[in-house]
Amino acid sequence: MPTITSYFGFLLAALTITSALLIGLSKIRLI
């Protein structure tokens, strides 16, 4: 089903963006 695939892709993208933001915030706090 394309709906499940697109939903999984959107979830994966959101997770990647969230983790990237968290890593960026932690790096800024470390400096």
UniProtKB/Swiss-Prot annotation:
Ranges annotated as spanning the membrane: 4-24
Topology with respect to the bilayer: Single-pass membrane protein
Single GO biological process annotation from the record: photosynthesis
Entries under InterPro entries matching the protein: Cyt_b6/f_cplx_su6 (IPR007802)
Subcellular localization(s) per the UniProt record: Plastid, Chloroplast thylakoid membrane
Transmembrane helix keyword on record: yes
A cellular-component GO term for this protein: cytochrome b6f complex
One term of GO molecular function: electron transporter, transferring electrons within cytochrome b6/f complex of photosystem II activity
Highest taxon in the source lineage: Eukaryota
Protein's UniProt keywords contain Thylakoid: yes
Keywords from the UniProt entry: Chloroplast, Electron transport, Membrane, Photosynthesis, Plastid, Thylakoid, Transmembrane, Transmembrane helix, Transport
Family listed: Belongs to the PetL family.
Record's function text: Component of the cytochrome b6-f complex, which mediates electron transfer between photosystem II (PSII) and photosystem I (PSI), cyclic electron flow around PSI, and state transitions. PetL is important for photoautotrophic growth as well as for electron transfer efficiency and stability of the cytochrome b6-f complex.
Oligomeric and partner information: The 4 large subunits of the cytochrome b6-f complex are cytochrome b6, subunit IV (17 kDa polypeptide, PetD), cytochrome f and the Rieske protein, while the 4 small subunits are PetG, PetL, PetM and PetN. The complex functions as a dimer.
Protein name: Cytochrome b6-f complex subunit 6
